[in-house]
Curated annotation (Swiss-Prot):
Keywords: Cytoplasm, Differentiation, Leucine-rich repeat, Nucleus, Repeat
LRR repeat positions: 295-315, 323-345
Region (Disordered): 1-48
Entry protein name: Leucine-rich repeat-containing protein 34
Main location: nucleus
Functional description taken from the UniProt entry: Highly expressed in stem cells where it may be involved in regulation of pluripotency. In embryonic stem cells (ESCs), important for normal expression of the pluripotency regulators POU5F1/OCT4 and KLF4. Also important for expression of the ectodermal marker gene NES and the endodermal marker gene GATA4. Promotes stem cell proliferation in vitro.
InterPro entries, per database record: Leu-rich_rpt (IPR001611), LRR-containing_regulator (IPR052201), LRR_dom_sf (IPR032675)
One example of a Gene Ontology biological process annotation: cell differentiation
Gene Ontology terms: cellular component: cytoplasm; nucleolus
Keyword Nucleus: yes
Length: 464
């Protein structure tokens, strides 16, 4: 059984002793809002928009003796203004603690307790981003309660909230019965192997969740293998992120199991396996599976230990695979030989790949120029990211020519040519497959699709 989260200030115990032992019990005021008739339920659902979310939040904080969080108050005021303008349908409430130029008071588990009481009746809010706050396991408990009550929520972002294995267990178990949530981000919460196993067990039951992000969650070998096993049967998950597990073996057992899964799963569209210690034998396992897989469109194997020998297998499978559209090979070591293998395939055989990232792969001019030549003959191949390699003059001229000829749009690459004293150089541009994976501004140029090209090219399910 998960550890009991501490009861926030102002919560008064009620109910049976068993219920009280398991979780914070309802206060009389909270219980009084539970509608007993359809008419009363409708009145509760309409309470927030009529009185205003900001006012409702202030009143609840006073009632529960909870300190008002000015950040939450400001965001709810913005939502109230949208409602007044008639923009109340399908709102994503953005209370992320890291997307403001001015420092904000981050949301704690106790703050989320009050917020969840408001949101459970807001049927026009279908997305919630509370990433980069201080929810901890207390907040995870109330997030689980919210998923029980709020049946319109399709997107929930809890990334980097210091949620541990116990909090992960609470979230995973409530998803056994939830049938509305489509996209869950748990990124950066150290739920570890124990929490990962609960999420894997959840996927045996849940048939509605489409995207699950468990990157940087300290998953263990056991849980990664469990996910690979479960996904041979789960037909709902379209995208899964298993980045940076804690692996102690050099045998690549997890990659072997993922390869077996890809042979049987024909629903998965995006697979992220960054920092899995994948070597050439591991990429061979994945490529062998891709001969039989007809659904995967986005493969992320960045930050691994793949060399030019591994590119032999990838280049070969790309000759016959017609579904892969985005491949992220960033921060490996494919060098000139690997780039040449890919270039030959993209020039003469493959007409389905749209985007390739070879950032920081120790590629020199020969390999980079070869890839640029592929873009001249392959009109489908439209996005390439090459920063962090060894540019010579021929490379700079080749990519400058690509952009000037219109074969490569400036937004579809991470370099920009400039001339000094008659010589062409390349500067870095902030575009990429997942440049703003950890943080995306809600305004300005960084919100353009070019900044997150991989996600724009391969949209999965409902977007937040």
């Amino acid at each position: 059984m998960a550890a009991q989260p501490p009861r926030p200030v102002g919560e008064r115990s009620m109910g049976s002793s068993r219920e009280a032992a398991r979780a914070p019990a309802r206060s009389p005021a909270w219980a009084s809002t539970q509608a007993s008739t359809p008419g009363a339920a409708l009145a509760v659902q309409r309470e927030s928009p009529e009185s205003g979310l900001q006012k409702h939040y202030s009143n609840l904080c006073m009632e529960k003796s909870q300190k008002i969080n000015p950040f939450i108050l400001h965001i709810l005021q913005e939502v109230d203004e949208e409602i007044k303008k008639g923009l109340a349908a399908g709102i994503t409430l953005n209370i992320a603690g890291n997307n403001r130029l001015v420092p904000v008071e981050r949301v704690t588990g106790e703050d989320f307790w009050i917020l969840s009481k408001i949101l459970k009746n807001c049927l026009y809010i279908n997305g919630l981003d509370v990433g980069y706050n201080l929810l901890c396991d207390v907040g995870a408990y109330y997030a689980a309660k919210l998923l029980q009550k709020q049946l319109n929520l399709i997107y929930l972002n809890l990334m980097f909230n210091d949620i541990g294995p116990e909090g992960g267990e609470l979230i995973a178990k409530v998803l056994h019965k939830n049938r509305t949530l489509k996209y869950l981000r748990m990124t950066g919460n150290k739920i570890e192997n124990k929490g990962g196993m609960f999420f894997a067990a959840m996927l045996q039951i849940n048939s509605s969740l489409e995207k699950l992000d468990l990157g940087d969650c300290d998953l263990g070998m056991q849980s990664v293998i469990a996910f690979a096993t479960v996904l041979t049967q789960n037909q709902a998950i379209k995208a899964i992120n298993l980045n940076r597990p804690i692996l102690y073996s050099e045998q690549e057992e997890s990659t072997v199991h993922v390869g077996r899964m890809l042979k049987e799963n024909h629903c998965l569209v995006a697979l992220h396996m960054c920092k899995h210690d994948i070597k050439n034998s591991g990429i061979q396992q994945l490529c062998d599976a891709l001969y039989l897989n007809s659904s995967l469109r986005y493969l992320d194997v960045s930050c691994n230990k793949i060399t030019h020998d591994g590119m032999v297998y990838l280049a070969d499978v790309l000759k016959s695979n017609t579904t892969l559209e985005v491949i992220d090979l960033s921060f490996n070591r494919i060098e000139n030989a690997g780039a040449n293998y890919l270039s030959e395939t993209l020039t003469s055989h493959n007409r389905s790949l749209k985007a390739l990232s070879v950032v920081s792969n120790n590629i020199e001019g020969e390999g980079l120029v070869a890839l640029s030549q592929s873009m001249k003959t392959n009109l489908t191949f439209s996005h390439i990211y090459i920063w962090g390699n060894k540019f010579d003059e021929a490379t700079c001229i080749a990519y400058s020519d690509l952009i000037q000829m219109g074969c490569l749009k400036p937004d579809n690459t991470d370099v920009e040519p400039f001339v000094v004293d008659g010589r062409v150089y390349l500067a870095e541009v902030s575009n990429g497959l997942k440049k703003h994976y950890y943080w995306t501004s809600t305004y300005g140029e960084s919100y353009d699709h070019s900044s997150n090209a991989g996600f724009a090219l391969v949209p999965v399910g409902q977007q937040p």
